[in-house]
Amino acid sequence: MRGGCAIYGDARVLNQSEILAVQGLTHEHAQILQIYDRATVNHSRIVHQVQLYGNATITHAFIEHRAEVFDFALIEGNKDNNVWICDCAKVYGHARVIAGTEEDAIPTLRYSSQVAEHALIEGNCVLKHHVLVGGHAEVRGGPILLDDRVLIEGQACIQGEILIEYQVEISGRATVIAFDGNTIHLRGPKVINGEDRITRTPLVGSL
C-alpha cells in the first residue's frame, strides 16, 4: 500500500491486493483514493484516486484513475483475465462485470461508461464514451464495442461480435446476437425495442 489513501469502516483489502494512491493526475486534484463501508478487494490492483464503497466486491481487477464501484456491484475477474475499469467509469446497483476464461475475455470500462441496476457485462466487452447499461440487460462478448451515446436497458441481450455506436438505444426484450463468424454493426441514431431481434447488420434505412 503506497501513497495517501483512506481505508476505513469494514472495508477489506485481501490476498496480495496492491493499493497505489496518486493524486494530481485527474481534474479532481485533491481527491484521494478511498475504500470504505463494506467494500472488499481481492487479488486486485487499485490505483490513483479510485473510490470503492458500499458492499462492492472486487476480485482480480485493475481499477484506476477516478473510477467508482459501489452499492452491491460485483467485479469478478479470474486467474486468466482481470476486469479493467478506468477513467471516470462507474459500476453500481447490483450490476455485475465478469471476465471470461477464454483468451482476451477482459471486460473494459473506460471514459464515462456506467453499468448499473441489475445489468451484466461478461467477457470481451469494451464500453467507452457515454455508455449506460442498466435494467436487467446482458452484454456478453464478443468482442463487443459500445461507444458514443449508447443506452442498453430493460431485458435486452447483446451477444457475439458486435459494434454499436452513436446514439443507439436498445430496450425491452430486444436481442442483438451475432452467430459464429458474423459481425453486426449498428450505428445510430436508432431505437431498438420491444421484441426486436437482430442477427445481422441491418440494411441502411431498414431500422
What are these regions (language model features)?
Residues 5, 11, 17, 23, ...:
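Residues at the loop-to-beta-strand transition
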